[in-house]
């Protein structure tokens, strides 16, 4: 159960609770970590500068059911919903979730994660597939998810007001400097 999960797992443990079973997450490969830290700085910097809420990293447990907990790579919670933040586990859906799939992970793991986030009604889900160099963005609208899959172009967030990312930047090395992208995004957001 979630209470057992919280009792047994320490802050630095990399476990998810899947159908009542503790499952250790694979250590991240460098391409995953580079993209994670780049997106954390980009999305986190944007959200902080605009005062939109909070962006948290991969150590934040999100309760799916009483026997299921996920650790998304990134999540966003709007300022108006900050009361859902709990020191131990998010029992309500965040407003936006980002998951990164690395070469060593099975595609079916991503399908299960996506299904879990859909189950609890996360309004926006970005699934980044590093091996296939594709993004699958899902947006909840009137009880159903609209799905967009792409390898290039501009991906605009519905949950994070004014935020957008060029999909090709997620898959190229070196990536553009976060400070340059933030400056451009913030200028666009200023009326």
Each model region followed by its residue ranges:
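Gly/Pro/Ser/Thr-rich low-complexity, intrinsically disordered segments predominantly at protein N-termini
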Residues: 1-191
């Amino acid at each position: 159960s979630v209470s057992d999960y919280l009792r047994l797992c320490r802050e630095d443990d990399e476990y998810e609770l899947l159908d009542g079973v503790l499952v250790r997450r694979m250590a991240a490969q460098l391409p995953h970590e580079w993209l994670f830290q780049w997106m954390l700085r980009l999305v986190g910097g944007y959200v902080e500068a605009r005062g939109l809420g909070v962006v948290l990293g991969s150590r934040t447990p999100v309760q799916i059911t009483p026997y299921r907990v996920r650790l998304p790579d990134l999540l966003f919670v709007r300022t108006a919903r900050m009361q859902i933040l709990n020191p131990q586990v998010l029992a309500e859906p965040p407003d936006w979730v980002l998951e990164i799939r690395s070469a060593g992970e099975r595609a079916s793991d991503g399908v299960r994660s996506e299904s879990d986030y859909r189950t609890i009604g996360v309004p926006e889900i970005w699934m980044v597939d590093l091996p296939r160099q594709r993004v699958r963005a899902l947006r909840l609208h009137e009880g159903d998810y609209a799905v967009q899959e792409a390898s290039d172009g501009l991906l605009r967030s519905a949950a994070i007001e004014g935020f957008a990312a060029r999909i090709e930047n997620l898959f190229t090395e070196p990536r553009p400097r976060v400070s340059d992208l933030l400056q451009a995004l913030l200028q666009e957001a200023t009326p």
